[in-house]
Amino acid sequence: MADFIVKDLSLADFGRKELDIAETEMPGLMALREEFGASKPLKGARIAGSLHMTVQTAVLIETLVALGADVRWASCNIFSTQDHAAAAIAASGVPVFAIKGETLEDYWAYTDKIFQFADGTCNMILDDGGDATLYILLGARVEAGETDLIAVPQSDEEVCLFNQIRKRMAETPGWFTKQRDAIKGVSEETTTGVHRLYDLHKKGLLPFPAINVNDSVTKSKFDNKYGCKESLVDGIRRATDVMMAGKVAVVCGYGDVGKGSAASLRGAGARVKVTEVDPICALQAAMDGFEVVVLEDVVQDADIFITTTGNRDVIRIEHMREMKDMAIVGNIGHFDNEIQVAALKNHKWTNIKDQVDMIEMPSGSRIILLSEGRLLNLGNATGHPSFVMSASFTNQVLAQIELWTKGADYQPGVYILPKALDEKVARLHLKKIGVKLTDVRPEQADYIGVKVEGPFKAEHYRY
């Protein structure tokens, strides 16, 4: 029986061609293959990967394999898979379980499958959003007697998650605890997943070390900002074909993702307003030239609304009922709870095309909802460009190597890769875009108290 689930294996050739192109735009990952391909530092690592199954992720997967790892993969979002990329990975012999538009039930079943290694346990997790980590740790707590944790689901997603946990416990008693105890570490890709890890550690519920990849400078200041700057408008255009020039757009949140999103919309000619709860970010937005407002003051006038906060209930049902006819509503934060999509269930929905729905309000006005409130840049388009994802994924590979080869040096907790590795990731990407670094002379290095080879900034420096 084939150890993969993809939409159409015949798409593998198309996927392979796109992988070949992506490799030329991902110098960091290709450099790691060259540096570590012979020594295979990930030999023996059995990595359960939960991250958007895109062309760029396929290059990451093949890099992990080239470095010796045994890998099983699922997407971390029901809409983000590129089916031809999944097919290419399946055809290469790597077990992958991902279909664009999969159901929530399938999503959690596929998450379960990434842990089904031949000997019964994985020993590493590569996560994006924290769902793979959540699945194992929540299941282990239920096995330990905390059955109330899955007694009352609060969403459709929790219904499917809790059912999958019960199913696995019935089929293989003690499975979650066995998996948890075998895991040596997790590397986490995104802001939301990192929040989960810090919360687990604070409560004493994180049993293994975790590396916070998101807060590597070469991830958060590049993927989150420059990636969103290109992919947000791409997703809106593919979904709606609307002209953004002259439109009023509201970006909720001005962290790194919000900064990139506001720049994306401004670059398309939109008149951008920003909402913020953090006074520092609000001041940044204002000094970047954006009007900082509260949502209630602009909800009737704006044409496009984008959430970027990582928080819940940012755009609520009362906001959507006040929006102008055919306002576009979308999210580029990791989860779908930034917009109160569940509150729209009893309204009239008209599906326009995949991941584009028109929803009629009681007043007769309509909104266009993108990707059901999930990541629109991946649901309605193909996500960030390969080059910026190379920086993020180079950090992921380095984090996996660090945890696998030096795991004994780490206690349970959340860690960040050292500055020297952050600078290495940046350095690996300079030649591709024609950057030439100025060399620091020894007397200059002495003057500012650094080594000639770096790192050039203190750990606390904010870029």
Swiss-Prot record:
It is found in: Cytoplasm. Keywords: Cytoplasm, Hydrolase, NAD, One-carbon metabolism. It catalyses: S-adenosyl-L-homocysteine + H2O = L-homocysteine + adenosine. Pfam families: AdoHcyase, AdoHcyase_NAD. Binds 1 NAD(+) per subunit. Pathway: Amino-acid biosynthesis; L-homocysteine biosynthesis; L-homocysteine from S-adenosyl-L-homocysteine: step 1/1. One of its GO terms (cellular component) is cytosol. Substrate binds at T54, D128, E189, K219, D223. GO terms for molecular function: adenosylhomocysteinase activity. Its EC number is 3.13.2.1. It comes from the Bacteria. Its cofactor is NAD(+). Transmembrane segments: none annotated. NAD(+) binds at residues 190-192, 224, 253-258, 276, 311, 332-334, 377. InterPro entries: Adenosylhomocyst_ase-like_sf, Adenosylhomocysteinase-like, Ado_hCys_hydrolase_NAD-bd, NAD(P)-bd_dom_sf, S-Ado-L-homoCys_hydrolase_CS. GO terms for biological process: L-homocysteine biosynthetic process; one-carbon metabolic process; S-adenosylmethionine cycle. NCBIfam families: ahcY, PRK05476.2-3. Belongs to the adenosylhomocysteinase family. May play a key role in the regulation of the intracellular concentration of adenosylhomocysteine. This is Adenosylhomocysteinase. It comes from Cereibacter sphaeroides (Rhodobacter sphaeroides).
